[in-house]
Amino acid sequence: MDRSSLLQLIQEQQLDPENTGFIGADTFAGLVHSHELPLDPTKLDMLVALAQSNERGQVCYQELVDLISSKRSSSFKRAIANGQRALPRDGLLDEPGLSVYKRFVRYVAYEILPCEVDRRWYFYRHRTCPPPVFMASVTLAQIIVFLCYGARLNKWVLQTYHPEYMKSPLVYHPGHRARAWRFLTYMFMHVGLEQLGFNALLQLMIGVPLEMVHGVLRISLLYLAGVLAGSLTVSITDMRAPVVGGSGGVYALCSAHLANVVMNWAGMRCPYKLLRMVLALVCMSSEVGRAVWLRFSPPLPASGPQPSFMAHLAGAVVGVSMGLTILRSYEERLRDQCGWWVVLLAYGTFLLFAIFWNVFAYDLLGADIPPPP
């Protein structure tokens, strides 16, 4: 239903005789029932919230159109937020007789979304198609690649110390910068079982719920942006080092989620959030510390520099900038967000600088690059 159709219906029913552009919430609720307009339970709750945000308990036509068509602009979301005290605080927790999958969807809603209105919106509108295939596919591909190289080299821990491992066409190496695919494909290779296990666990525990809520397009964009930023940052700041592992993408997802939790601390309803926040920060810091130790104090003799840790840090920066913008724009068009264009411009500027650096700076600076394996 568009605005003109709604206006025609209201005029036919003489629900706004003075043509104010507003209609009472109770009056519109009666219109919904009499004409069977497509409003599910969460939209009816939002209708109450919209009415609460208005001193006279009325709603403007455009907000009603947004409500019916499921479009959520920034102004629409602000109006909902102003009146959301009318909603029960823990409404979804009291839903009886849910299936196992629906209980999981409810769990995801409380883990990821900071607002009761958003949680209800997601819970009632969630569909199983398309499924969250991106994070699961990436994790499966990483495990398959690891098993193939582990079986071939008969080495499962610290694989990068094997001379044949770094010859893989997937690894990013500064001597192979012209092979542009390596700036992304290094995410399928890992130092060993310890790094793969850490990344796979976070991708499934955090990445899959984020993908369920925000969709495959946004989460895949964030993950790949973190991966690309990781290799490009290494090519600028640690010019002699190769890179392996999906840590750039993992840290982009985790940093975005943690930043979103912190900025919406009061609204998040996940249990033990302080303890879990501390545990997540300790684990992420420990992984960075392990990567720094392997880079500068390798425990085994190696034929060249070991993988850099800068991809972790670059991914975290992408997460708290681009990622936070994405997560805070749930069910809103990113192109309508001013902050999104600022972040996109900054990321594009970084890409152009990194490309220029990789094309010209190595020769101009006379960088001592180790020979490619």
Swiss-Prot record:
Domain of life the protein comes from: Eukaryota
Alphabetized UniProt keyword annotations: Hydrolase, Membrane, Protease, Serine protease, Transmembrane, Transmembrane helix
InterPro entries: EF-hand-dom_pair, Peptidase_S54_rhomboid_dom, Peptidase_S54_rhomboid_met, Rhomboid-like_sf, Rhomboid_IM_Serine_Proteases
GO cellular component: membrane
Transmembrane segments: 131-151, 196-216, 219-239, 243-263, 275-294, 307-327, 340-360
Membrane topology, record value: Multi-pass membrane protein
Main location: membrane
Protein's cellular compartments: Membrane
UniProt keyword RNA-binding present: no
Reaction(s) catalysed by this chain's protein: Cleaves type-1 transmembrane domains using a catalytic dyad composed of serine and histidine that are contributed by different transmembrane domains
Sample GO molecular function, one term: serine-type endopeptidase activity
GO biological process, alphabetically ordered: proteolysis
Residue numbers annotated as active site: S247, H312
Entry coiled-coil feature ranges: none
Enzyme Commission number, as recorded: 3.4.21.105
Family, per entry: Belongs to the peptidase S54 family.
Entries under PANTHER family matching the protein: RHOMBOID-RELATED PROTEIN, RHOMBOID-RELATED PROTEIN 1
Function field: May be involved in regulated intramembrane proteolysis and the subsequent release of functional polypeptides from their membrane anchors.
Protein name: Rhomboid-related protein 1
Higher taxonomy: Eukaryota, Metazoa, Chordata, Craniata, Vertebrata
